[in-house]
Amino acid sequence: MPATPNNVPEPSRTDPALIRNFCIIAHIDHGKSTLADRMLQLTGVVDQRQMRAQYLDRMDIERERGITIKSQAVRLPWAPTQEPGNTHILNMIDTPGHVDFTYEVSRSLAACEGTVLLVDAAQGIEAQTLANLYLAMENDLKIIPVLNKIDLPAAQPEKFSEELANLIGCDPEDVLKVSAKTGLGVEALLDKVVAEVPAPVGVADAPARAMIFDSVYDSYRGVVTYVRVIDGQLNKRERIRMMSTGATHELLEIGVSSPEMKPADGLGVGEVGYLITGVKDVRQSKVGDTITTLNKGATEALGGYKDPKPMVFSGLYPLDGSDYPELRDALDKLQLNDAALVYEPETSAALGFGFRVGFLGLLHLDVIRERLEREFGLDLIATAPNVVYRVLMEDGSEHTVTNPSEFPEGKISEVYEPVVRATILAPSEFIGSIMELCQTRRGTLLGMDYLSEDRVEIRYTLPLAEIVFDFFDQLKSKTRGYASLDYEPTGEQASSLVKVDILLHGDKVDAFSAITHKDAAYAYGVRLVAKLRELIPRQAFEVPIQAAIGSRVIARETIRAIRKDVLAKCYGGDISRKRKLLEKQKEGKKRMKMVGSVEVPQEAFIAVLSSDDSGGSAKGKK
């Protein structure tokens, strides 16, 4: 039964023994946000009239795509069915489920003592659930296995509870069966959270230490920082210090979100809440950082803090060059809310002024691009995504390349590219086609495990550059949509990579340059010149389109010249007269060819850069 507001313990005065911090781990579309909605309703923190689906997903893109991008934290009062008078406080931390946001997930997990592992009873375990489960196990969290959507006709609760039990090492009977849509079994789940998740452990009179697990930008109040207090206490109007940057701020407001913000006097050990310091830049409150009080503060930060590193780079250019200032302002505003987004201005001879933007992965790229187009009304061209290469020259110098046009000329001794460890889960009948796909993408098989007789987990080492194009789309189409993919960076390897330039009429077009593996360079060149031949309109003179590695041309197509019929006014008559006219035309064409320049229409850029087979598309990565 929902706890009535009169017996709910106040923040800062809650006994840590009554607090339970937990999160929900689930693959996309397995019903995590719906389960969160049911919990909000059952505990009575959201009025029935204000309830809407996916209550915690505030961004339009989150609601439409059904994905959670930013973590949320909600304080839920709950009195277990066995002891109705004893109200506990459950802090539910809603985590992103996507592989691009793994660091955010790991920080959210570090703020919890337990986790609900939610699996769709019709689909079973997917790769991203598995990746987050391993993260939870590394953090020694208590895992509560739950099967969702048991009201579906296609549900197979017995089969999947067996699979879950094998994975975690519990009995199939321990797997709870719920339907987040109808609310069936959710009360039992909340009771189990109270019974099984350990209470937070911390020293109440030690110097205050709190971990930031998320920060969001509010246009009225500045940055709102979500924290979990580990030791000590934070009080209103205290001065605090960020331990990674040493910056100090005053706590203007402190409180809990339930799920709307409720100010309080302070936060004690084990509590999860928010702080407002009036800071205007999210980069000053970094996810994973430790907060302490300015006087008598802690000397040792909590472990696990990392700066998010961009993995994938893409150039973003406005279709209309005059929108450049708007694009800069839009990126500035998005960066307030997304500390992992990095960008710097760049110019392209072909596309004009734009920005080189760094992302955590393909979904991150897609979401940012969609937000720029939707929230700021910008029309953009995005160049094909690139990864970061490290190039060692024979003279010992080293270059970091995030853009093909920066690839150094001259004698190169080694090129290093980032590699990832990919985990693919799929029905066992597709093993052959998955292995074939990974082999063509220069993958190395690490191992293979059967989770049950018809589901298999395949592990590969793959170059990140091979994944950022259309790997996910290909994987889905080869497995009829059943495979799921997860990857994590594992360092770098030396590869024989070359830069392929596209020359139009002898001039390089920087927007079409690409860094590819030596073996794939010829195919890339042939495909691109053939495509450009179709897209570039015919000129009054002949235009060669060439693909070249350095000074060696590897592929060529020619756009034939348009010819005017100069013989139209000659009726019969002398052949030498006709020859004279044709020679004169030929001379003119030759002169034109020497001074002429080729205009590449905007449509050709868009078609080439967003085409599936040249790899500019990240659409399938949802």
UniProtKB/Swiss-Prot annotation:
The keyword DNA-binding does not apply. GO terms for cellular component: plasma membrane. It is found in: Cell membrane. It is a peripheral membrane protein. One of its GO terms (molecular function) is translation elongation factor activity. Keywords: Cell membrane, GTP-binding, Hydrolase, Membrane, Nucleotide-binding, Protein biosynthesis. Gene3D superfamilies: 3.30.70.240, Elongation factor 4, C-terminal domain, Elongation Factor G (Translational Gtpase), domain 3, P-loop containing nucleotide triphosphate hydrolases, Translation factors. It is an enzyme of class 3 (hydrolase). HAMAP family: LepA. Belongs to the TRAFAC class translation factor GTPase superfamily. Classic translation factor GTPase family. LepA subfamily. PANTHER family: TRANSLATION FACTOR GUF1 HOMOLOG, CHLOROPLASTIC, TRANSLATION FACTOR GUF1-RELATED. This is Elongation factor 4. The gene is lepA.
